[in-house]
Amino acid sequence: MSEDQPHANGAYYRRVLLKLSGEGLLGNKEFGLDLEMVDRVAGEVKAAHDRGIQVCLVIGGGNIFRGISTAAKGMDRTSADYMGMLATVMNALAVQNALEKRGVQTRVQSAIPMSMVCEPYIRRRAIRHMEKGRVVIFAAGTGNPFFTTDTAAALRAVEMNCDAILKATQVDGVYSADPNKVPDAVRFESLTFTDVLTRDLRVMDTSAIALARDNNIPIVVFSLHTPGALADVLDRRGRFTEILCDSHQE
């Protein structure tokens, strides 16, 4: 990431990983996909792509199936997590379809091979896709149970040499508490990874935070529900929280 001046495309990033929660694709529904929301997300990704920014995505599956909560109700955790991974593939295919309807060549790569549906995850191929101007969506998490899609996002961001992880959430940054439950919760403009861990702010799970910290990849948290928010983040405008290594925090 360039902290002083933007790249030739006008943005401060060359290659980013966008992390979307499955719940973010619900829209006003209680379950499944809101296709209008999927299309809006695709429009924001296309706008970034059209500026020459290389974009890859990791999408959760909580709108369809949540492995952790299902395991808590009695299902074997491993089986529940694999079902959750399959839900992420469904979401990835939906976003791929929306992007390609807008003329953006998109590839889905799954950590669990399913050759009739999408490509297997191959690091060099994914990088080459982005270099050729394609969007890449990584599905099925890490391919292993007991790892969240947040951890998968951090892992893929490291493997893809991304400049930042852009985490789209239900709120416009990181707060001291859930702003929907605590009206006077404080929103942070910037934090260090140490802040996140010591204050237990639950931005991502600790393994994802550790991966990003150890590889010096900033995390930018912003609202999925604000139109144009992705473009604003790419220009370092608007409302968001940036999480940096301690050495970058003034």
Curated annotation (Swiss-Prot):
Q: Which UniProt keywords apply?
A: ATP-binding, Cytoplasm, Kinase, Nucleotide-binding, Pyrimidine biosynthesis, Transferase
Chief location bin: cytoplasm
Keyword Kinase assigned: yes
Where is the protein situated, by its record's location annotation?
Answer: Cytoplasm
User: From what organism does this protein derive?
Assistant: Rhodospirillum rubrum (strain ATCC 11170 / ATH 1.1.1 / DSM 467 / LMG 4362 / NCIMB 8255 / S1)
Q: What name does the UniProt record give this protein? A: Uridylate kinase
Which residues are recorded as binding ATP?
K19, L20, S21, G22, G62, R66, T169, Q170, Y175, D178
Tell me the function of this protein.
Catalyzes the reversible phosphorylation of UMP to UDP.
Q: Which residues cross the membrane?
A: none
Q: Which SUPFAM superfamilies match?
A: Carbamate kinase-like
**Per the UniProt record, which EC number(s) apply here?**
2.7.4.22
Entry's family note: Belongs to the UMP kinase family.
What is any one GO biological process for this UniProt entry? UDP biosynthetic process
Catalytic activity reported: UMP + ATP = UDP + ADP
